[in-house]
UniProtKB/Swiss-Prot annotation:
It comes from Pyrococcus furiosus (strain ATCC 43587 / DSM 3638 / JCM 8422 / Vc1). The lineage of its organism: Archaea, Methanobacteriati, Methanobacteriota, Thermococci, Thermococcales. SUPFAM superfamilies: GHMP Kinase, C-terminal domain (SSF55060), Ribosomal protein S5 domain 2-like (SSF54211). This is Galactokinase. The active site is at D151 (proton acceptor). Monomer. One of its GO terms (biological process) is galactose metabolic process.
Amino acid sequence: MSKITVKSPGRVNLIGEHTDYTYGYVMPMAIDLYTIITAEKYDKVQLYSEHFNEEKTFTLDNLTKEGSWIDYVKGVLWVLIQEGYKIGGLKGKITGDLPLGAGLSSSASFEVGILEVLNQLYNLNIDPLKKALLAKKAENEFVGVPCGILDQFAVVFGKKDNVIFLDTQTLQYEYIPFPKDVSVLVFYTGVKRELASSEYAERKRIAEESLRILGKESSKEVTEKDLGKLPPLHRKFFSYIVRENARVLEVRDALKEGDIEKVGKILTTAHWDLAENYRVSCEELDFFVKKAMELGAYGARLTGAGFGGSAIALVDKDKAKTIGDAILREYLAKFSWKAKYFVVKPSDGVGV
C-alpha cells in the first residue's frame, strides 16, 4: 500500500455537558472541520505538522512523552503495541482546517486519525468501538488527560446530517436526524482554556465522589431524593448533572418531533445552568449566548469543558453568516481576544 489520506472530523456536543464522566447521556455530532493525515509505511515515525510548522522523528522503541503535539501520536502507538497489534512506523504530514484548542476536540480528532492511518496501513481490522476506546486510552493513560468517551466516540461514529444520542455507560447509541435547514454556528471565544484542566479535574473528582457517597454507578440512577444525601457543594454540582441528563432526553424527543424551537430553548437553559450552578462559563461565553439569542438564534450554549473555548448557536441556515458576522463585530469591540466563528453541520466520522 502506498500513501493514504485519512480525514478525521472535529466534534461539537449539542447537549450533555460534563455528564460523560459519571456515565450519563450525551449528544455529540462530528462536524465538517477536519484533521487530515497523509502517510505511508516507514521504518520509523517521521511526521510534519503544518499547524506547528514542525517535523518530529522518533523510533517505536522510544515512546517517551515530550510535552508536545507528538505525544498524541506516541500515545496511539503505545496503546496499539500494548494491546498486541503488529505495527511499524509511518511517514507523512498533518494538515486540515480544524482549529486547535478551540474546544472542538482537535486532540480526539488527531488521535483517531492517527489510529485510522495505522489501522489502514497495517490492516489491523480494528472495529469502530475499539477505535474509540483505544484513542481514549491513549489520551487517558499516555497523554494524561482524564477525558470521558464522548469526543473519541463522536469522531469515530459521526454520521452526516445526524447527531448521536449516546448512553456513556452502556455505549448504546442512536442516530437522530438533525434538520437540514438549521446550521450550527460555532463561536471560538479566543479564550484559551487554561483553567479547564484543573477545574475540569476538580468537577470530575467531586462528581465521582458523589457517586461513591450515593453508592451509584451512573448519574442516570440518581434521583432528586438522593441529592439530599450529598454535602452542599457536591449537591449543587451533582444536581446540575441530574438536570442535564434529563435535558438530553428532552432534546432527543424534541428532535424526533422536529421541534427545533424547543431544542433551542433547552440548550439555552442548559447554558445558564452550566454558568450559574456548575460554574464553568465565563464572561465571553455568556456574551455570545446573549447576543445570539438577541439576533434570533433558536438557542445557544457553551460546548466542551467551558472556561473559554467555544460556544454554539442553532440558527437558520440562510441567516448563519449574518448572525455570525454581527456577533463577531460586537465581540471584538468589547474583548481583545482573537475570536472567530465557523458554520458547521453534522458530518461522517473518520474515514479514508
